[in-house]
């Protein structure tokens, strides 16, 4: 059985995925982050704008990541009916993460879905990558529905590629078709949310893109001077 090592249950950033042969495989987010730079110009423009305003863009980015990680953790604990441990986070981070949790609760009460699992960690033996699916659920007909949580201000192409890779990973390892895939965008400023259905056409394109990234990754080392 493939193994998954997690240094902290509150974060996906330190999750190590291993295939059956014991070798480590990269995560979906590592592959996308290392091989794709479609939003590089947007990021550079934002960094320049923050610097001009006297802000440290690295600190802002890291803080946003911390809040997003905490929000994911809170939602997971809520779904599993577990206590939340908040000792290592600031009051501001906790407040913003609770906004995201409140947004999730508002969405969940009318979602008409049956919860099955949270933070499902899987490793693809066929394609040699690992990933953590935020939420697995079923609709009232018993069909499988995958949901990915985002606390970012926008939904980008990278996110589509990510959920496409998760869907293929789930279908390979669980041998069950995924009926629908959604991205649930949770606000950190209020209890508002946006529910994005990802079409089959977009998922197909996302999976094709991810396959190209898988092929590109081994070439990266060969091209270094």
Regions from the PLM with identified roles:
Residues 1-130, 225:
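Metal-dependent nuclease catalytic cores that hydrolyze phosphodiester bonds in DNA/RNA
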Residues 120-214, 219-225:
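Nucleic-acid nuclease catalytic cores
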């Amino acid at each position: 059985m493939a193994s998954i090592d997690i240094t902290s249950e509150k974060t996906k950033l330190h999750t190590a995925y291993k295939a059956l042969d014991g070798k480590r495989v990269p995560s979906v987010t590592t592959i996308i982050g290392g091989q794709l730079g479609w939003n590089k110009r947007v990021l550079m423009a934002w960094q320049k704008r923050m610097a001009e305003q006297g802000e440290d863009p690295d600190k802002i980015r890291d803080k946003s990541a911390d809040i997003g990680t905490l929000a994911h953790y809170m939602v997971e604990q809520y779904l599993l009916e577990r206590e939340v441990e908040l000792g290592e986070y600031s009051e501001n981070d906790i407040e913003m993460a609770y906004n995201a949790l409140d947004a999730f609760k508002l969405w969940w009460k009318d979602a008409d879905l049956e919860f099955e699992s949270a933070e499902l960690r899987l490793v693809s033996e066929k394609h040699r990558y690992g990933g953590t699916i935020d939420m697995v659920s079923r609709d009232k007909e018993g069909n499988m529905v995958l949901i990915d949580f985002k606390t970012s201000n926008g939904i980008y192409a990278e996110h589509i590629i990510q959920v496409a890779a998760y869907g293929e990973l789930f279908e390979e390892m669980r041998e069950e078709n995924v009926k629908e895939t959604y991205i649930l965008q949770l606000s950190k400023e209020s209890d508002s949310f946006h529910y994005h259905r990802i079409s089959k056409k977009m998922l197909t394109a996302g999976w094709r893109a991810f396959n190209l990234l898988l092929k590109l990754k081994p070439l990266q080392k060969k091209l270094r001077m």
